[in-house]
Amino acid sequence: MACAWRSRSRADPLNWGKAAEELSGSHLEAVKRMVEEYRKPVVTMEGATTIAMVAAVAAGSDTRVELDESARGRVKESSDWVMNSMMNGTDSYGVTTGFGATSHRRTKEGGALQRELIRFLNAGAFGTGTDGHVLPAAATRAAMLVRVNTLLQGYSGIRFEILETIATLLNANVTPCLPLRGTITASGDLVPLSYIAGLVTGRPNSMATAPDGSKVNAAEAFKIAGIQHGFFELQPKEGLAMVNGTAVGSGLASMVLFEANVLSLLAEVLSGVFCEVMNGKPEFTDHLTHKLKHHPGQIEAAAIMEHILEGSSYMMLAKKLGELDPLMKPKQDRYALRTSPQWLGPQIEVIRAATKSIEREINSVNDNPLIDVSRGKAIHGGNFQGTPIGVSMDNTRLAIAAIGKLMFAQFSELVNDFYNNGLPSNLSGGRNPSLDYGFKGAEIAMASYCSELQFLGNPVTNHVQSAEQHNQDVNSLGLISSRKTAEAIDILKLMSSTFLVALCQAIDLRHLEENVKNAVKSCVKTVARKTLSTDNNGHLHNARFCEKDLLLTIDREAVFAYADDPCSANYPLMQKMRAVLVEHALANGEAEAHVETSVFAKLAMFEQELRAVLPKEVEAARSAVENGTAAQQNRIAECRSYPLYRFVRKELGTEYLTGEKTRSPGEEVDKVFVAMNQGKHIDALLECLKEWNGEPLPLC
């Protein structure tokens, strides 16, 4: 094994080549691999653990942990070397010496020294156990898996049987209780990891969470897990091997990054859906723009959005409306849409780099001293310094904050009728806008989420304090940064859930808009032909030429500017149709002087007839949409983004929201948020991209 490692090292002595190779391929393919790994029923610890494997075991699902049996020999060699070296009088840190700044002290009582290590490191506070001072069980499970993965590599001087016991606890879903706070992740996560050691050694203060959520002591924990042997009496170095590592910080970081990768992909797809419902211009995804910028994250983000928008029924309709009247909206969309690939691309690059950094960390040997059996020596170093965790988590959290900022900007445009290209204010879906304020509360909530998320974007790693008698004078704060990033992920999921519900509301509003517009055009056409086509004698009337302009007026007018009262003289529809008739009357010349040929004389009859029938037609169109019998089916069914809409509306059973119903936005958002926490959105997300070949559309 050592020879093979040296051979690889000579080929790539600084590991830059391997690090670069790990980032090859698309981010989408990387996410697909993560999801596939997450769903495997067995995780075998073979020194190639991924963040997805850690996240799967952390979730406490049916994923089983198996140790690589071939590791038993090298683990035993390392353990035996420690025992032999102590018997031979070798002076080794943490075996015959004190710890940290007091390592000048000496003892020959190796077992007692390990017991004392665990005792003095049990310095955490748990409160009542229910008031938020206990590390979540999922994070503890992640830490257990990562620590075992490190110790299996055979450089730490610990018995294989201890690792088997930790794996047994994992498989039985029995989780030691660890304090939420109290580690600086250098020299490793000493305080929290000491509670795992405390459980396997049977310390009286050790507690665990049973599969049913109850708290049990160490003896009950072993019994529930089916562990027959008693508690371990630690041999020299074994306590230090268990606590002197970065597993708690890197374990939680693994969980965080699994979600961050999925959520960043979701943000790309939601930007595409945002373009669809906003009648945006897909030109912003053109590959040449992004090719000339060179950044791979941006190029992929644009290509994914391009794929979502290619052939989209909404984009076809938006193009048609744009050709009808190029001045209906600005020449370019606002930055939240038009520069979304440029904004998201760097965040994806940061998250990918952090993912690989953490995967290197969870597969590293990160305790001290390291036992090199081949050279017969203990090497004193500092791999316990969790700087890759602190830095990666700070960077990831800043990326998450940036994604949330973009999402909030897009949401703010979506609910604002000055910017959303014809959708109602606050996405109000009811008949009476004076009694329906739609997503107004949701926008306030989104502002709150975004503000907190931007605060969390501040770094943790610049708040280092010198610790442990100035021995640990620089330290990574890895777990603290991981915890803050986990908070940020939670907030981004709240924002994503809220945005997704709002986008589905907008999709349904576009469906209603199209059906109401068609109904209005049909009604106006019928009324125009009835009242404007002929005079009292049945002769063709000049007013008949108004029909085309009347229909063009309807096409240009925002449906929700008049839908609640289509014949109101205060609303633009009737005003603009009247203006059409007046303009034709002014152009009618001398014929206007005679009542039989006057266009203006037809105006009152036209409006009177329209008032009699148009409100009924609009209500009928609205009712048909609500009943599922609309003449024009919802365009979303023809789009690549449909799986996400189907997930929210069909699978989760959320509703189109109106002030007339009792259902609140928060109730619907909560359904999506809970499902997102359970990972149920992932399949729908990936289905949106199942046809993408991993490349931008060719330039032509």
Swiss-Prot record:
PTM statement from Swiss-Prot or TrEMBL: Contains an active site 4-methylidene-imidazol-5-one (MIO), which is formed autocatalytically by cyclization and dehydration of residues Ala-Ser-Gly.
Oligomeric form and interacting partners: Homotetramer.
Gene Ontology MF annotations: ammonia-lyase activity; phenylalanine ammonia-lyase activity
Subcellular location field: Cytoplasm
Role: This is a key enzyme of plant metabolism catalyzing the first reaction in the biosynthesis from L-phenylalanine of a wide variety of natural products based on the phenylpropane skeleton.
Keywords from the named record: Cytoplasm, Lyase, Phenylalanine catabolism, Phenylpropanoid metabolism
2,3-didehydroalanine (Ser): modified positions: 187
Coiled-coil parts of chain: none
Catalytic activity entry: L-phenylalanine = (E)-cinnamate + NH4(+)
Gene Ontology biological process terms from the UniProt entry: cinnamic acid biosynthetic process; L-phenylalanine catabolic process
Listed EC numbers: 4.3.1.24
UniProt: (E)-cinnamate binding residues: 244, 332, 338, 368, 440, 468, 471
Family: Belongs to the PAL/histidase family.
Pathway per the UniProt entry: Phenylpropanoid metabolism; trans-cinnamate biosynthesis; trans-cinnamate from L-phenylalanine: step 1/1
Active site: 93 (proton donor/acceptor)
Position of the 5-imidazolinone (Ala-Gly) cross-link: 186-188
Natural source organism: Triticum aestivum (Wheat)
GO terms under cellular component: cytoplasm
Protein name listed in UniProt: Phenylalanine ammonia-lyase
UniProt xrefs under CDD domains: PAL-HAL (cd00332)
Principal place of residence: cytoplasm
